[in-house]
């Protein structure tokens, strides 16, 4: 699949369950999306893993620590969407000071100023991004976190030519950096952090040849 096809399949898959799931944080239910359950992080994890074989992390704490931070201006809690792409994830503060940046919720950008996510009740739901972000910004949190506004936008599907796992592994193997290509292909498909490290390694090598 091309980068655009990957982004579209993630969005289409997520939207296929619009208002069809009950909210649950139960570990036995939260990732059973096609069985009618889910929560915010379980929903986005499920589709990335099922459709692309990418393990972006099963909860917001894991997810915010993976992927690449997108360079977006945030004004009054609302991101400038000109640098955003379908499938990007928006992370919001909750009420737990112990988590990375107090992260407590995640939504998926689906294009045209809209986002999709499963917060509570029946979901997931499509929302106008600017309205939702302003609403979160206005919600109080702990004294340390102040509000439940947007923390950052993260990307897991890149839009340059170096996106295919097979291409990355082939180049690393060709240069004698890794052996057992099949094993590395599987590792990079399952581990987003390993994927990004390998990708950065190849990019660095190319730039310094």
Regions found by a protein language model. Name each.
Residues 40-46, 162-209:
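Short, solvent-exposed alpha-helical surface patches in non-cytosolic proteins
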Residues 105-106, 169:
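Conserved beta-strand and immediately adjacent loop positions that scaffold enzyme active sites
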């Amino acid at each position: 699949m091309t980068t655009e096809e990957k982004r579209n399949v993630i969005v289409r898959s997520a939207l296929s369950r619009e208002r069809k799931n009950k909210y649950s944080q139960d570990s036995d239910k939260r990732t059973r999306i096609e069985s009618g359950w889910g929560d915010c992080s379980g929903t986005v994890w499920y589709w990335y893993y099922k459709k692309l074989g990418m393990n972006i992390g099963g909860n917001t704490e894991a997810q915010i620590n993976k992927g690449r931070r997108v360079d977006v201006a945030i004004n009054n809690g609302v991101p400038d969407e000109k640098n955003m792409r379908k499938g990007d994830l928006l992370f919001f503060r909750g009420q737990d000071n112990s988590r990375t940046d107090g992260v407590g919720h995640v939504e998926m950008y689906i294009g045209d100023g809209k986002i999709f996510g499963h917060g509570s009740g029946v979901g997931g739901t499509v929302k106008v991004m600017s309205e939702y972000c302003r609403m979160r910004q206005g919600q109080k949190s702990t004294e340390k976190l102040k509000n439940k506004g947007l923390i950052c936008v993260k990307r897991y599907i890149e839009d340059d030519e170096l996106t295919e796992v097979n291409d990355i592994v082939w180049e690393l193997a060709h240069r004698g950096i890794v052996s057992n290509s099949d094993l590395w292909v599987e590792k990079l498909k399952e581990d987003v952090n390993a994927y990004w490290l390998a990708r950065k390694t190849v990019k660095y090598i190319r730039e310094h040849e």
